[in-house]
Structures are given as structure tokens and as C-alpha cells.
Amino acid sequence: MIAYKITSNKDFAGQLFKADTFDRFLLSEAVFNVPYTVSIDGTFSSGEETGNVSWGDVRGICMQLIKGKELPKSFHIVLKLSEENLSRTLASIDNNLDPSKVSGLFFNIRFEEDSFTLTTGTAVSDFQVMRTVNEAWDRLTLRFFRSKDIALEEL
């Protein structure tokens, strides 16, 4: 797990809320503190679909929550890799990794005090593979953000 400060709020907010940069990620949860608090559980509530909704499907709704003359007091958004991307990512880290031991790779995005921070996260059930997965996810996260021209500095 590693934490970064996003160095350009405007550019990052544009990529998060206006562009499709994160649309393939799944929403785990989001909480927006505007004049009121709005919590979004990223799981489907209908019986037809299961799992988590994609960020692309709720991005517009979330943008409406923060839009206005004043910045929101704070918000946090937790995005995770889809099952397909999780399997592919784990294979790129180490072909011998057992995917059943890793239930998620996450981005924790927080906006607070007019600043964005990003923290990587993993959900790993096997202590022996935890370090390998954590370090690789940190590297892959940095590579992804740099490929999207999102400037970061490590905290």
C-alpha cells in the first residue's frame, strides 16, 4: 500500500468525472459530503445483475453531486479491478499466483481540504503472496497514472 498526492486537482477531476479514464473499473463505494452526505454502495441492487457497477455507469451521477459553485467538503471513492482485469493483472505479476487468494486490487481516492490523495489497496488472504501482490500493484498503479498523464507525488 502506498499513498500519493495528486498534484493537479483540475486535471485529475476532469479525468475522474468527465473522461472515460476510470470507466472500466468497478465502484466498490463512494461517499460525498456536499451540503448533505450521499453514500453509494457499488453493488447492484436488482436480482438481474450481481457484483459491482462500473464507474462509467455511475460517473455522471457522481459528477452531478459535486457540480456547483462550491467545492464539496470532501468525498472518497473506492474503485477496484474487474474480475477479468484482476485475473489478467495477477497473471502479469506471477503466473503461479492463485487468483482465489486475491479478492481485490483497489484505488482509494479521497478529496479533502481541497486536495486529492490516492492510496493503493489489496485484499489478499494469503500472507505469503501479500508482499508480492502489494508491491506489484503499487508499481502498476504508478505506471497506469503516468500513462494517463496524471501527476503524482508520493506521500
Residue positions per predicted region:
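Charge-rich, low-complexity N-terminal segments
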Residues: 1-60
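Generic structural motif
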Residues: 9, 37-39, 43, 82-86, ...
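Acidic-enriched, low-complexity/disordered segments with a strong bias for Aspartate over Glutamate
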Residues: 11, 20-23, 41, 57, ...
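A generic structural micro-environment signature
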Residues: 23, 28, 33, 87, ...
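Mixed-charge, glycine-accented linear interaction segment located at domain edges/termini
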Residues: 120-155
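General N-terminal targeting signals
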Residues: 34, 39, 44, 49, ...
